[in-house]
Amino acid sequence: MAPIRVALIGLSSSSPSWLSLAHLSYLLSARGQQKFQIVALQNSSLSAAEAAIKKYNFDPTVVKAYGSPEDLAKDENVDLVVSGTRVDVHYGNLKRLLEGWKATGKTAGKGVYSEWPLASNLQQVEELVALAKETGIKTAVGTQGWASPVVKKIGEVLKSGRVGKVLSSEVRLSGVTAEREVMQEKTEYFTRREVGGNMWSIGGGHLIDLLQSALGELTNVKSHFHIQRPLVPLKDSTTGTITRTVTSNTPDLLYVVGSLPASDTVQQNASLHLRMRRGPPFPGEPAFVWTLTGEKGEIRVSSKESVAIILGAGEVKIEIHDYQTDKVEEVEWKWEEWQEELPAPARNVGSVYEGVWEAWNEGISKEEGREKRYNDWEVAGRRHELLERLLVDNGF
């Protein structure tokens, strides 16, 4: 099979980013290069794209530079476009790209893999989802927590019947930002709802997707959101000095409660409870604790890192309490060999790329028999709808 030809939108030459740390690390790995080939970069200007080509030592005769999505859309040598910009830039780039493909009439075999969130607001998301459906392009979105071997190991334990059916599940998360009062200047946009990238839309979105992928789609959802610290001092990451103070209009404390559907591993109307709080946990406590209370035992997942499962970084412990013996046992989990060779941020993201490859080469997919390959934009639309509804319900 020929490699899938990839164009990257938003690869910066000036600073490390999620696109370089996670996506590029996989794409340039030996395994990644067997399946994908980078053939183009698009940035906010042609010169910015050319600077990135030089920064990452790409061959300019192979990797083309573009300064607009319209120009990128004209490149017939591109199969898959990966958008890794900040969330408020996704919509403009992706809409113009899809409209460019539509205008040429050459949408067959084209695909887009966008980072999460898909766009700044639900209206933009719905427009992109509809346009993708109209043009028939393949889509993927960067919600990759479901691909974590921790989540897969939990699935194995549940299917084994060891703890019986899940009666309830609870998640407590403290973190997302390192400090409870101050934010880095570069993450100031977390305080502005209109940007679309904040604790709830990013951290909450990833977590809600992970939980629903593991346990089923939530119903009867209720919530309470609150801004505990509306005034947020911003700190220069280099000097450590406070540069200014801004007023936040995004929640920093969130409670969500819902019901889970019946399945082979979950009781009908089992309860799910989520609490997210910005800032570090109480000293000595894990930043992330996820419990699954079953009929015969309880699973406890914990980590000192609040988003370890999603990012693939940090230590994560799985423990099982057997009610009958009253003993607690730690359950081992591990990455696949090819993932261990990658930097931590690239491991779960690499699974999404593997899924894209399989989906584009159905023979391989059927032979390997994977149940889930990646989330598409329709799934992203459902996640965005829930996130937006809860924000509106709470007056945001």
What is the predicted function of each stretch?
Residues 63-76:
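Short acidic low-complexity segments
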Residues 2-3, 33, 42, 47, ...:
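C-terminal helix-rich "cap/oligomerization" subdomain common to oxidoreductases
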Residues 278-351:
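Glycine-enriched catalytic-core subsegment of oxygenase/oxidase enzymes
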Residues 1-59:
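N-terminal Rossmann-like dinucleotide-binding module
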Residues 202-311, 358-363:
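Contiguous beta-strand/loop segments that form the cofactor/metal-binding neighborhood of enzyme cores
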Residues 79-80, 86, 91-147, 161:
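Beta-strand-loop-alpha-helix segment that lines the small-molecule cofactor/substrate pocket
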Residues 12-15, 145-248:
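Predominantly a Rossmann-like dinucleotide-binding segment in NAD(P)-dependent oxidoreductases
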Residues 39, 63, 79, 110, ...:
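Conserved acidic residues
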